[in-house]
A protein has these predicted regions:
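P-loop/Walker A NTP-binding region and its immediately flanking N-terminal helices
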Residues: 1-50
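P-loop NTP-binding core
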Residues: 52-287
Length: 287
């Protein structure tokens, strides 16, 4: 483990100012208000285990299947979205090299049958620490994606679930958030924290950031609990909850180990049908 990775594990910010730094707030506000935002950039956020990466991978692949130009930026050091799209985690260049080492974004993008990927790696775990002394550190990802935004209809960013500099970069790069929520009671507990984070970032960094949609995952409509959770989420996010729900499906769980999205692994299964339905609903909302 590198010294940067050790530092990254020890350094855990607890508030907005410790991530951004007071001296960056005015600059951030000015840039956010005077410059255009990255069009068609969607950030997938949420706690681990709710289907965040699964949804990022499979919605991107489903849109590619439907003929759209899609880039998936894996901004999580675990790099599960990278491997889920069939890209080796040990690829020579990735998003870390773009942000820290100055590699051109296009040179780091990997083309796959399921969509283009800006891959992640374990090196990104220390990236947040390395960014601390860099100018405009919260805008590094946005600048990297700006270089290729005209090449794609949609850019998806899979980010870490914790509040840290990597996540802040993703929030500054995105127009919208897509929030997967598991159809279980405890999934409701983080909603207030999520909305508070969005309000802070919108107020200080990215005034156009919005909740694009909320997706219920691992959903079992046969249980009263799942139905109650769905009702509560719809009350919390009126008009934002997708009609499509993602069911529990063993084939969805198997697909990542084969390095394939579900539409390539088993297009006839319930999971693939659900993500294709989600892709069509997504397009209706965003075209």
């Amino acid at each position: 483990m590198s010294s940067y990775q050790v530092l990254a594990r020890k350094w855990r910010p607890h508030d907005f100012e410790s991530i951004v730094g007071q001296d960056h707030v005015v600059t951030a506000l000015t840039r956010a208000l005077t410059e255009g935002r990255l069009h068609h950039a969607y950030l997938f956020t949420g706690t681990r285990g709710v289907g965040k990466t699964t949804t990022c991978v499979n919605l991107a692949a489903a849109l590619k299947y439907l003929g759209k130009r899609v880039l998936l930026c894996d901004f999580d050091p675990q790099a599960n979205a990278t491997s889920g799209m069939g890209v080796d985690k040990s690829v020579s260049n990735g998003v870390y090299d773009v942000l820290i080492n100055g590699v051109e974004t296009r040179k780091a993008i990997v083309t796959t049958p399921y969509g283009d990927v800006l891959p992640s790696s374990k090196a990104l775990a220390g990236g947040g620490v390395e960014m601390i002394e860099m100018a405009d550190r919260q805008f590094l990802l946005r600048s990297a994606l700006d270089a290729v935004r005209e090449d794609y209809d949609y850019i998806f960013v899979d980010c870490p679930p914790s509040l840290e500099l990597l996540t802040l970069n993703a929030l500054c790069a995105a127009d919208s958030l897509l929030v997967p929520l598991q159809g279980e009671y405890y999934a409701l507990e983080g909603l207030s924290d999520l909305m508070n984070t969005v309000r802070i970032v919108r107020r200080n960094m990215n005034p156009r950031l919005q909740i694009e949609g909320v997706l219920l995952t691992m959903f079992d409509g046969r249980t009263n609990l799942a139905i109650q959770v769905a009702q509560e989420v719809k009350r919390f996010f009126p008009g934002k909850v997708y009609a499509t729900v993602i069911p529990r499906n063993i084939r969805l769980s198997e697909a990542p180990s084969h390095g394939k999205p579900i539409t390539a692994y088993d297009r006839g299964c319930r999971g693939a049908e659900a993500y294709l339905a989600l892709a069509n609903e997504f397009l209706k909302k965003n075209t």
